Amino acid sequence: MRAYLDLMQKILDEGTVKSDRTGTGTISLFGHQMRFNLAEGFPLVTTKKCHLRSIIHELLWFLNGDTNTAYLKEHGVSIWDEWADENGDLGPVYGAQWRSWPAADGSVIDQIQKAVDDIKHNPDSRRIIVSAWNVGELDKMALAPCHAFFQFYVADGKLSCQLYQRSCDVFLGLPFNIASYALLTHMMAQQCDLEVGDFVWTGGDVHLYSNHMEQTALQLTREPRPLPTLVIKRKPDSIFDYKFEDFEIEGYDPHPGIKAPVAI
């Protein structure tokens, strides 16, 4: 994943020093895109070890429509703890918007199920979009959606996905985001009897936090290794029926992990 390292270097070379909501400070670029051919390997960063358990469980948590950290904590995933209240609640974050977007008539819209249905029955639609950016509920969310919306595209028997991420912590968050949406694309493709195409990542405010500079410099000294392969061991009845045990990453040989503080 040379493109990931190239982005880090570009931010260091061309970025603007900016303040931010957390008070940490960043070096930031506006607007960047990367494309990953999912048939050529699973895009999991190899220049540091990524916590795959957290990536998989978080995605399953989103797909379940869950917005409480209890499931995550039960499975040893702590990535949302800093934002949860004393009861583990986060407000109507990703899972709620994906699965239960509130409509004007009082009903709710399951955007994920609608996306599956459209991919299967109307694959040429240009409206196969899932949005977490619900303006009317942003104030109720513990954290406004960073990966705000994504679109699916079907061509030549392949399913591609493009994500728009309005705000991106490149050192800590981006490896998770790329792997998570690549995994989702594989799952959706399997459910819809398609091959995988590309995952396209588009970032808005793309930044490195000022307290991640040493870690970034270390990572830039490392040479990327071959990408691993994702194996999905079974095809469940629906996109909502996958289990953690259904996934295996083969051939993942990363450099050692690099710890860094989370900006809250």
Curated annotation (Swiss-Prot):
Known pathway: Pyrimidine metabolism; dTTP biosynthesis
Pfam families found in the cross-reference section: Thymidylat_synt
Main function: Catalyzes the reductive methylation of 2'-deoxyuridine-5'-monophosphate (dUMP) to 2'-deoxythymidine-5'-monophosphate (dTMP) while utilizing 5,10-methylenetetrahydrofolate (mTHF) as the methyl donor and reductant in the reaction, yielding dihydrofolate (DHF) as a by-product. This enzymatic reaction provides an intracellular de novo source of dTMP, an essential precursor for DNA biosynthesis.
Family the entry assigns: Belongs to the thymidylate synthase family. Bacterial-type ThyA subfamily.
Location relative to the cell: Cytoplasm
EC number from the UniProt entry: 2.1.1.45
Subunit structure: Homodimer.
Keyword annotations from UniProtKB, A to Z: Cytoplasm, Methyltransferase, Nucleotide biosynthesis, Transferase
GO CC terms: cytosol
Residues the entry annotates as binding (6R)-5,10-methylene-5,6,7,8-tetrahydrofolate: H51, D169, A263
Gene3D superfamilies: Thymidylate synthase/dCMP hydroxymethylase domain
Organism in which the protein naturally occurs: Aeromonas hydrophila subsp. hydrophila (strain ATCC 7966 / DSM 30187 / BCRC 13018 / CCUG 14551 / JCM 1027 / KCTC 2358 / NCIMB 9240 / NCTC 8049)
Listed GO MF terms: thymidylate synthase activity
Predominant subcellular localization, coarse grouping: cytoplasm
Top EC class, one word: transferase
Superkingdom classification of source: Bacteria
Residues at the catalytic site: C146 (nucleophile)
Annotated protein name in UniProt: Thymidylate synthase
Cited InterPro entries: Thymidate_synth/dCMP_Mease (IPR045097), Thymidate_synth/dCMP_Mease_dom (IPR023451), Thymidate_synth/dCMP_Mease_sf (IPR036926), Thymidylate_synthase (IPR000398), Thymidylate_synthase_AS (IPR020940)
